[in-house]
Amino acid sequence: MKIHHLNCGTDCPLGGALFDGRSVGPLGRIVCHCLLIETDADGLVLVDTGYGLADVHHPHRPPSPRITLPWRLMLNIRLRETETALRQVEALGFKAADVRHIVVTHLDFDHAGGLEDFSDATVHVMAREYDDATGPRASVVARNRWRPRQPDGVQQWQRYGARGEPWFGFDAVRDLTGLPPDILLVPLPGHTWGHAGVAVQTGEGWLLHAGDAYFYREEMRGARRRCTPGLRAYQRLMEVDARSRLLNQARLRELSIGRAGQVTIACAHDPVELERCQAGQPL
């Protein structure tokens, strides 16, 4: 099993280091860290998709924009075709049809934008996330985070309940239809009720893509949590339940310390984590 670490979308919010902890100018840099997994017998598997081709070319087309203007301005999203998962899959010598499965941490617009670029793929998601994203969206945040046109092209969904077998103290859904047991969904509610991490057995240990369960590298791997002001505020804006989010974040932090040799944890938006993963360096 081979894993490629991709950046499938870049945001450059005003605030610089107040967001990413390292920029020297007025703009920060936040990535959309996705995984492309080459399995032995089940084709290619994507974990999240970032922004898709239609997001790049028609982000605000009425009557239902794929990305709402307030969120695009707030995040200062840089939509680039070369960063879409499809174009990166093609650059690696594969075709869209080679991607047979997509496992999503959740269906926010910056994670699900590329779903329809892989129309032959089965999309695996927590049932609660699917229901919340496709049902009535009452709050302002819900209406902006879940964009109906992004998942419209999905032909095959596989939805899962929250119960499963233990995985390092977390419940985990192990039997993902059509996928090897080396790929698991790990429910991590808080950012959304149906949010989950995706755990992958690499042969050298487990890699847990934690999605938006945390946003900043120093929220893990240290006794005390540290997060930049910008990302701390954004997490609070987007959370559906602060207690669940912070509890799961604390559990992940304990896992990152106590099982450092067995489990590597990376989130969806930290550029330093992405760069280290791409370089094969420890986090």
What are these regions (language model features)?
Residues 2, 10-87, 198-211:
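Conserved beta-strand hairpin/beta-sheet module of binuclear metal-dependent hydrolase folds
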Residues 2-5, 19-22, 34-39, 161-203:
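Core dinuclear metal-dependent hydrolase active-site scaffold
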Residues 49-51, 107, 129, 190-192, ...:
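Active-site metal-binding loops of divalent metal-dependent hydrolases
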Residues 53, 66-67, 71-85, 204-283:
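Cap/insert and terminal regions of metallo-dependent hydrolase folds
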Residues 60-125:
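Active-site metal-binding motif and surrounding structural segment of the metallo-beta-lactamase
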Residues 77-98, 127-187, 237-262:
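Metallo-beta-lactamase
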Residues 122-127, 209-211:
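Short hydrophobic/aromatic-enriched beta-strand-loop microsegments
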